[in-house]
Amino acid sequence: MSATLLRWVCTGAALGALCTTAPPAHAAPDAPGPEERSVTQLLTDLQRLYRSAEETSETYNATEEKLTEQRARAATLDRRLAKARASVRDSRSDAGRFARQQYQATSNLSPYMRLLLARDPQRALDQGQVLRRAAAGRAATVERLTGGEKKAGDLAGAAKRALAARTALAARQKKQRDRVEGQLRDVEQLLSSLTVEQLAALRQAEEADTADAQRRFLASGALGGSPATRPPSRQGDTALDYAVRQIGRPYKWGAEGPKAFDCSGLTQRAWAHAGRRIPRTSQEQWAELRRIPLSKLRPGDLVVYFRKATHVALYMGDGKVVQAPRPGARVKVSPIAANPVLGAVRPDPKGRAMDRYTPPKLPAKAKAVSGSDIGYDRSHAPGATDSR
């Protein structure tokens, strides 16, 4: 068995199998090599690798979003802490000035005796009122100083915790990135071990499976008996139009455009272009956006795939979606059943349907990127030029 294939067989994260560098004496026989497996087995293995990589990629995206939020929180706390410390310095300066004034004005005479001995008793009374106000000011300064020191201490603690959280998120992100890199290398290694004939057979098998899944999906009546296109909302129309204009751009994990996209990067960017902010990952989009029956789908709605909601696409109408499929592929139009459908969500549930609607015209390159998504390109791997 080649070293390349051995590494592929030992990919625990992708294949769910445990592999050690020194197998026990009674280890199970090695998995059959590519030349020994049927096209169906190869396609199943390859699709499992793709799904595993995409699932980890979406987890990475969620961590990236949390890390961005934590960086912003830490920066805000740092600014507030600097302001609080400046306020404490000012309060300490005021307190010192009042202390010096009080020391300089110290007298052994009681206020009553000072009033009796005053040349102008009324003026002495007025001065007493001024002094009382000054005393109140000193008390307020001391109170501000005490409160400011407490606030500065609290903010310093919060800033320290925010830094620790940011550091932990960055470490988690690196582990997830390394895992995606490994899973994408597994895809590359498997594909590089196949012959031209095997690759062609895989593409044909995938296209046949997709066509069969689409026929069964439409026959089930899941889309309400007819995949006819309903009019979208104005925002949905704008989001779909943006997605269609990205057809032909490469898939790249973690990418949010404008030169490359992953699946949820495309859906988020499309709806942002329409003026609505939606969550970054497919899992968050599924969890947080309004779910709708498939029978109510309209263009611009999001179709979510797989049991763990690890893939997402924009519904185009007529039983089709626009999606960024997976590494090695490009943004394209696909049958809605190209992957197992989990459900659908609507980013603008209160958006009124347009009175008149004309579907977007597909670019000429749409046909060139149709068909199977089998493939892999090193330029789409982690560490390649980042589009974000």
Where are these regions (language model features)?
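Long, contiguous alpha-helical "rod/stalk" segments
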Residues: D30-R100, A158-A165
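Short coil/loop "hinge" linkers that interrupt or connect long alpha-helical coiled-coils or helical hairpins
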Residues: A86-A140, T195-G224
